[in-house]
């Protein structure tokens, strides 16, 4: 007899820190009550990997190509059924932003020392911004590499 498996629905989403040497891309959402700077973000679509989601969301929201996509960590979002997965990636080519005005009000590059931060916010986005600002985005290497 086959067992029935009942699970809660979980929606995978990515938070993306796009970096270009000493700069990180930050944005403000369009049409939302939250008006502070954040990283790019979006939901995975059926049939794509989260790495493909990273590249697609960056292209859709700001028109940039990225490379060297690397996982940072995840966080369940308590206000919804979303599992946030944080990634850093590097700019691949031209840094000229083509903004999707339906999604974003603004997107701009910030030098590490000029990054606006909110130390009190307990979120994956804020943690990733602080990690980059404090120069801690390198992937940990195993001994012998």
Model-derived segments and their meaning:
Residues 2-6:
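Short, small-residue-biased leader/transition segments that mark boundaries at the very start
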Residues 7-51:
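Extended interfacial segments that mediate partner engagement and assembly in macromolecular machines
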Residues 12-14, 22, 35, 62, ...:
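Structural beta-strand/beta-sheet cores of well-ordered domains, especially the beta-sheet scaffolds
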Residues 21-23, 30, 90-94, 112-114:
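Short loop segments at secondary-structure junctions
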Residues 28-29, 39-41, 66-75, 91, ...:
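Active-site proximal loops enriched in glycine and acidic residues that flank catalytic Cys/His/Asp
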Residues 33-37, 100-145:
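Nudix hydrolase/Nudix homology domain
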Residues 39-73, 87:
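The catalytic Nudix box helix
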Residues 75-98:
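Active-site-adjacent beta-strand/loop module that shapes the phosphate/pyrophosphate-binding cleft
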């Amino acid at each position: 007899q086959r067992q029935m498996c009942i699970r809660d629905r979980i929606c995978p989403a990515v938070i993306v820190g796009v970096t270009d040497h000493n700069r990180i891309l930050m944005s403000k959402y369009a049409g939302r009550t939250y008006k502070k700077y954040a990283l790019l973000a979006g939901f995975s679509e059926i049939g794509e990997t989260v790495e493909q989601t990273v590249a697609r969301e960056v292209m859709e929201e700001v028109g940039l190509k990225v490379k060297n996509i690397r996982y940072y960590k995840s966080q369940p979002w308590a206000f919804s059924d979303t599992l946030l997965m944080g990634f850093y990636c590097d700019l691949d080519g031209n840094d000229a932003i083509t903004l999707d005005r339906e999604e974003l009000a603004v997107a701009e590059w910030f030098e590490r020392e000029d990054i606006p931060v909110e130390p009190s916010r307990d979120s994956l986005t804020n943690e990733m911004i602080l990690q980059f600002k404090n120069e801690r985005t390198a992937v940990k290497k195993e001994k012998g590499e």
